[in-house]
């Protein structure tokens, strides 16, 4: 292409310059001829000199014309071709790079596609304390919060039981993804599976599709949606670490559930939100976090059984609450420290005592609760209550059931041992 441009430009310049050079040569020869005629016939020496002069002039004219006709077109052609090639290269390079990056972005943005398809069905749940009011707005303050997702267009919402129950003197509010807020009523509760449903009076809501947890594989990509720390519409992603994590391994002796373990971040406020696969289907309900990279969700297959039983109860008009009776209220969410969990905690933190063999980890404290007023903090480890050793969460429930007014609790906060006193509330 470049060679063709050079040849074409050379031919063009030759055609343009040849007539001018020819006229110059003709004029020069006519001048020389006139001068020789005016002198007449001179001597032989004068003629020889004149002839020698004409030969030299013709030689000089022929050399200059040949050099000009060859060098100028070639130089100009090469220069123009080089400029055109460089400009053409500059124009092509960014275009190729932009197309390549755009294609890769669309190819690997699968998580964004999942969120766009199902994010509108996720809701933010607030628990309002009706005894305490904000000084400026006059509205009840938020005692705790959680997440949920719409499973029926007529306002049925699924969440965790611990998000909405065992909280006396409170009311439940639900905020949709479009910003609208509605009061909610608790329809069904099963504390055994830690599941509950809420109802708001609105219709035409976007619904979350329910998938199958039985087909999950370890290493499969999942996305956790919810409102951690009251930050609505938060998205985290990870993989399934284990599909059959037995409740006994987590110290939950009253439950017969094989939890989904994931490294997707599930923090305070994510509880009750959906854990979805790359098809945008809920395959679990976010339940609890032990530490960074270790979180658990209730498999959706257990959720379907709960929903079927709840629908049957509603048809029969029976009581909507099932499971264990409501206990005295302390205001914490806890997890038994099994050997596996202890090993993980000790490997991730240098502040864990080496001689710690058992206890209960406090991983959430509800603001305004007796535990919060007594000084408990997330991350504390309960080792004794009323001078009795605590080995699992059942021991804590037993201490609450004893009916004593105050609980004398021994905790580990880092490497320090501390004593706190809590007065639980009656239901």
Curated annotation (Swiss-Prot):
GO biological process: apoptotic process; positive regulation of apoptotic process; proteolysis
InterPro entries registered for this protein in UniProt: PDZ, PDZ_6, PDZ_sf, Peptidase_S1_PA, Peptidase_S1C
EC number: 3.4.21.108
Compartments it resides in: Mitochondrion intermembrane space; Mitochondrion membrane
Domain PDZ: 330-415
Positions of the UniProt region annotated as Serine protease: 144-307
Topology in the lipid bilayer: Single-pass membrane protein
GO cellular component, one term: mitochondrial membrane
Catalytic activity: Cleavage of non-polar aliphatic amino-acids at the P1 position, with a preference for Val, Ile and Met. At the P2 and P3 positions, Arg is selected most strongly with a secondary preference for other hydrophilic residues
Disulfide linkage: none
Locus of motif IAP-binding: 78-81
Listed transmembrane segments: 66-86
Alphabetical list of PANTHER family matching this protein: SERINE PROTEASE FAMILY S1C HTRA-RELATED, SERINE PROTEASE HTRA2, MITOCHONDRIAL
Role, per record: Serine protease that shows proteolytic activity against a non-specific substrate beta-casein. Promotes or induces cell death either by direct binding to and inhibition of BIRC proteins (also called inhibitor of apoptosis proteins, IAPs), leading to an increase in caspase activity, or by a BIRC inhibition-independent, caspase-independent and serine protease activity-dependent mechanism. Can antagonize antiapoptotic activity of th/Diap1 by directly inducing the degradation of th/Diap1.
Subunit relationships: Interacts with th/DIAP1 (via BIR 2 domain).
The family this protein is said to belong to: Belongs to the peptidase S1C family.
Protein's UniProt name: Serine protease HTRA2, mitochondrial
Species the sequence originates in: Drosophila pseudoobscura pseudoobscura (Fruit fly)
GN (gene name): HtrA2
């Amino acid at each position: 292409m470049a060679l063709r441009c050079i040849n074409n430009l050379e031919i063009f310049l030759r055609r343009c310059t040849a007539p001018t050079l020819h006229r110059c040569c003709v004029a020069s020869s006519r001048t020389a001829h006139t001068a020789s005629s005016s002198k007449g016939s001179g001597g032989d020496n004068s003629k020889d000199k004149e002839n020698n002069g004409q030969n030299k002039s013709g030689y000089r004219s022929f050399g200059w014309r040949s050099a000009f006709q060859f060098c100028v077109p070639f130089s100009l052609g090469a220069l123009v071709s080089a400029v055109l090639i460089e400009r053409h290269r500059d124009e092509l390079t960014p275009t190729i790079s932009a197309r390549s990056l755009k294609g890769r972005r669309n190819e690997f943005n699968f998580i964004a596609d999942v969120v766009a398809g199902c994010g509108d069905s996720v809701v933010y749940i607030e628990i309002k304390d009706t005894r305490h009011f904000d000084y400026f707005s006059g509205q009840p303050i938020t005692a705790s919060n959680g997440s949920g997702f719409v499973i029926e267009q007529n306002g049925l919402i699924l969440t965790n039981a611990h998000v909405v129950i065992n909280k006396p003197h409170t009311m439940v509010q639900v905020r949709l993804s479009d910003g609208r807020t509605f009061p909610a009523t608790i329809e069904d509760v099963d504390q055994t599976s830690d599941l509950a449903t809420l109802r708001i009076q609105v219709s035409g809501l976007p619904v979350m599709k329910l998938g199958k947890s039985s087909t999950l594989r370890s290493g499969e990509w999942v996305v956790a949606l919810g409102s951690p720390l009251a930050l609505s519409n938060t998205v985290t992603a990870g993989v399934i670490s284990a599909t059959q994590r037995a409740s006994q391994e987590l110290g939950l002796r009253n439950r017969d559930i094989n939890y989904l373990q994931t490294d997707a971040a599930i923090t305070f406020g994510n509880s009750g939100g959906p854990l979805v696969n790359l098809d945008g289907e809920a395959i679990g309900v976010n339940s609890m976090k032990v530490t960074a990279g270790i979180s658990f969700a209730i498999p959706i297959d257990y959720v379907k059984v709960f929903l079927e039983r709840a629908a049957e109860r509603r048809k029969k008009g029976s009581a909507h609450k099932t499971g264990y009776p409501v206990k005295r209220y302390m205001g914490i969410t806890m997890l038994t420290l099994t050997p596996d969990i202890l090993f993980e905690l000790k490997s991730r933190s240098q502040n864990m005592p080496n001689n710690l063999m058992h206890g209960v980890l406090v991983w959430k404290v509800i603001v305004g609760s007796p535990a919060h007023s007594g000084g408990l903090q997330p991350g504390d480890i309960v080792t004794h209550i009323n001078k009795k050793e605590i080995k699992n969460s059942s021991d804590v429930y037993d201490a609450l059931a004893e009916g004593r007014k105050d609980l004398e609790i021994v905790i580990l906060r880092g490497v320090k041992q501390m004593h706190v006193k809590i007065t639980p509330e009656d239901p």
